[in-house]
């Protein structure tokens, strides 16, 4: 039987091994931020926690504890113990925690023990583990050389990164493809969950034995997910690799990402009619989001072309007209913006090349 308390020195092992954790915080706390390997089985529901918190402020700790026991009692208490025991049966090596590793953790552990179930709780709870992960992100740029993968929109940076063991996929963690049209069907994680998942990915990367940390050249915001400032500053100072691709391939890749995959995803989720409506709204609203930068005239031109493409798609099952507005968007908006940004980092460019050439360059970098 392991010790009743899991020490802070084991945080790294918990995250690297995706150790199952029973999170006994209230649902509202879990929703704000949690770890990927945790399951929310609360000691108190939101309303119960709120009442106990109010009592604590007005009457002190002992009165709050007494109220908590009266709220979680009888059949309610038994149901929660059974839910915890069921989780532990399915995850025999599970740990538990609350926010600070205090009373809620101790009480849950005690009630389970009385039911014949032994579960260690984590020292410091969620708060201390979260602080540990923040430290991982802040320290990461000093652990390995940082390389930033740049390239024009549609050149396949994400596809390339997914083939490289040196890479951490920031857009995958943020569930957003980074561009104005980068929104996915499922929502992005909360900011806290984005940071938690980034830190765990960095921890896993540091144990992989690779020579560098390869990241896509991102803006501070990936959709609504903000990169931690210290980490972003390090990315801005990193050496740059430029992935190159032909315009024809870029166009086809963007049509596949913006049109084919998104349309299929919406239809699968919502059905054909509602799916097409949601898909159309996704395209048109993505365009609206860059209207100020495009200017009214150019926005209107792109919107008209986009609507023509949508009409042809729904009436003739033909997506070829989408290539027209995508091509215009590239050459009037994305490419000039990219070239301007690249000019500002030209002194840090180590290599430019195709997918194959870039793979070969990185393979040789690994052995230097």
UniProtKB/Swiss-Prot annotation:
Transmembrane segments: none annotated. GO terms for molecular function: transferase activity, transferring alkyl or aryl (other than methyl) groups; tRNA 2-selenouridine synthase activity. It comes from the Bacteria. Keywords: Selenium, Transferase. It is an enzyme of class 2 (transferase). The keyword Transferase applies. The keyword Transcription regulation does not apply. SMART domains: RHOD (SM00450). InterPro entries: Rhodanese-like_dom (IPR001763), Rhodanese-like_dom_sf (IPR036873), SelU (IPR017582). It catalyses: 5-methylaminomethyl-2-thiouridine(34) in tRNA + selenophosphate + (2E)-geranyl diphosphate + H2O + H(+) = 5-methylaminomethyl-2-selenouridine(34) in tRNA + (2E)-thiogeraniol + phosphate + diphosphate; 5-methylaminomethyl-2-thiouridine(34) in tRNA + (2E)-geranyl diphosphate = 5-methylaminomethyl-S-(2E)-geranyl-thiouridine(34) in tRNA + diphosphate; 5-methylaminomethyl-S-(2E)-geranyl-thiouridine(34) in tRNA + selenophosphate + H(+) = 5-methylaminomethyl-2-(Se-phospho)selenouridine(34) in tRNA + (2E)-thiogeraniol; 5-methylaminomethyl-2-(Se-phospho)selenouridine(34) in tRNA + H2O = 5-methylaminomethyl-2-selenouridine(34) in tRNA + phosphate. Monomer. Belongs to the SelU family. This is tRNA 2-selenouridine synthase.
